[in-house]
Design a protein with these regions (language model features):
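Phospho-regulated, low-complexity intrinsically disordered regions of nuclear gene-regulatory
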Residues: 2-26, 38, 43-113
Length: 113
């Protein structure tokens, strides 16, 4: 099923595909048990390659900055995390501040899972 289309026909799935390897790499470096989507986005932006990828992703979507970031925070990054075997979705993180989407809680898989 074709998803939402950005400018020039780019899809959420295409942008997620481009970010997946970086997301997986960052997940392997995380410590702790749980994090929210916005916490992960903050981590993503804390490294130069992540900052460049984040900016490239919302710009590639092609709408105004706020609308494009809504797609990245609410669809692309959650899709990356759902695709990963390194984390599981644990529910919405109501009360967590993210001006672009309702963040979720994610649990890191134990090394034996």
């Amino acid at each position: 099923m074709q998803g939402h289309l950005g400018k020039d026909g780019v899809t959420v799935e295409q942008i997620a595909d481009d970010l997946q390897q970086l997301v997986e790499s960052l997940l392997l470096r995380l410590e702790g048990e749980m994090f929210t989507t916005i916490q992960f986005i903050d981590i993503l932006q804390s490294v130069p390659e992540g900052q460049a990828a984040y900016e490239g992703a919302w710009r590639r979507w092609g709408e105004q900055e706020h609308a494009s970031k809504m797609v990245i925070h609410g669809q692309v990054i959650p899709l990356n995390l759902r695709r990963s075997r390194l984390v599981s979705w644990e529910g919405y993180a109501y009360g967590e501040e993210d001006e672009y989407a309702v963040p979720a809680w994610w649990k890191l898989a134990s090394p034996h899972e």
